[in-house]
């Protein structure tokens, strides 16, 4: 009797040493490209997990000032996953920062997965943290339709760009030696998937500097041709998450209104819409999820911009002296069934009567 093949796998695809060597006060960013099709050919990725672990050696007595970025996750500057062919103009992971990955995963899991902070003081610090790239959408109907079907692509290039101390601390004279770190890429995969369809979907990030108080600040970089299933806004004051930046969300398009202007709805979006996606006790300062497929599990309930553009405007407060405000949009857009369309159903044969 032939054995049934494994229908899932959790496997290390690739590993490499951290790309920055030597003791440095600051270092130039270094990118590492990884062609995933060399290590997986039949997988339907539910998620990828990038693990960074090892020792950071810190020397000196001149500590710097924290930049406000997530520590230590902020050592990742940018992640991108590009495919060939590029389906419906989608880049599956489009220029995500460490913060974008961290808080997208918070919404997906229901809690923040965060490592301990690395101080800028002399010593050897053992570290171990993860970046999660979610494809399959938990709490959705037919979640397998959102997996990343690698066999549909001739190339799937994951590029990770890393930095060193300068990402987490400014000023000071201490040196960091991060050459003792290693990076591993794991895949949580399914096999022999019998899905009606596979969607083309993108996880993207865009940044909007807030320079002054404005009641209709435009988020005008969202093209039509897609369903927008998720919008996570992260408001920042000097790189630190803050609830003092956004007062209202206005989301409209084609005569439809999802969130209205003039409602001063940011607080309720944060305290109700966002909090309901998370476990009890999670901090939501500066975190707003007005749009999430996880609420009802159906892409048919998403923000529809397939044929007409949508308009997103924010009511924002401008920064005071010595402050830099920024709004980070971490979003998901998709085209249903674009990677694999459902096969047409064959009509049942007509029975002949005598």
Model regions and ranges:
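Beta-strand-centric surfaces of beta-sandwich/beta-rich domains
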Residues: 1-354
């Amino acid at each position: 009797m032939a054995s049934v093949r494994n229908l899932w796998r959790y496997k290390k695809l690739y590993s490499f040493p951290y790309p920055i060597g030597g003791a440095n006060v600051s270092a130039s960013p270094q990118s590492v490209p990884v062609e995933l099709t060399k290590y997986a050919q039949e997988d339907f990725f539910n998620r990828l997990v990038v693990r960074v672990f090892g020792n950071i050696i810190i020397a000196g007595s001149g500590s710097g000032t924290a930049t406000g970025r997530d520590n230590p996750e902020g050592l990742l500057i940018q992640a991108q996953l590009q495919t060939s062919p590029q389906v419906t103009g989608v880049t599956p992971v489009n220029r995500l920062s460490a913060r974008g990955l961290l808080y997208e995963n918070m919404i997906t899991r229901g809690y923040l997965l965060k490592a301990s902070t690395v101080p800028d003081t002399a010593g050897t610090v053992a570290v171990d943290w993860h970046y999660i790239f979610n494809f399959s959408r938990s709490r959705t109907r037919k979640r397998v339709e959102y997996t990343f079907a690698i066999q549909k692509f001739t190339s799937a290039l994951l590029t990770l760009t890393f930095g060193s101390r300068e990402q987490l601390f400014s000023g000071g004279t201490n040196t960091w030696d991060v050459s003792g770190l290693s990076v591993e890429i794991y895949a949580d995969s399914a096999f022999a998937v019998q899905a009606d369809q596979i969607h083309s979907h993108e996880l993207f990030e865009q940044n909007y500097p807030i320079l002054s108080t404005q009641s209709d600040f435009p988020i005008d970089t969202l093209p039509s041709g897609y369903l927008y299933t998720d919008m996570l806004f992260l408001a920042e004051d000097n790189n630190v998450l803050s609830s003092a930046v956004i007062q209202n969300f206005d989301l409209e398009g084609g005569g439809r209104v999802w969130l209205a202007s003039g409602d001063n709805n940011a607080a309720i979006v944060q305290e109700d819409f966002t909090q309901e996606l998370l476990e009890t006790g999670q901090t939501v300062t500066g975190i707003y999820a007005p749009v999430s497929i996880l609420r009802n599990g159906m892409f048919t309930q998403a923000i529809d911009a397939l044929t007409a553009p949508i308009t997103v405007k924010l009511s924002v407060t401008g920064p005071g002296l010595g402050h830099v405000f920024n709004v980070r949009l971490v979003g998901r857009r998709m085209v249903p069934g674009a990677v694999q369309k459902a096969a047409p159903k064959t009509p049942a044969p007509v029975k002949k009567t005598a």
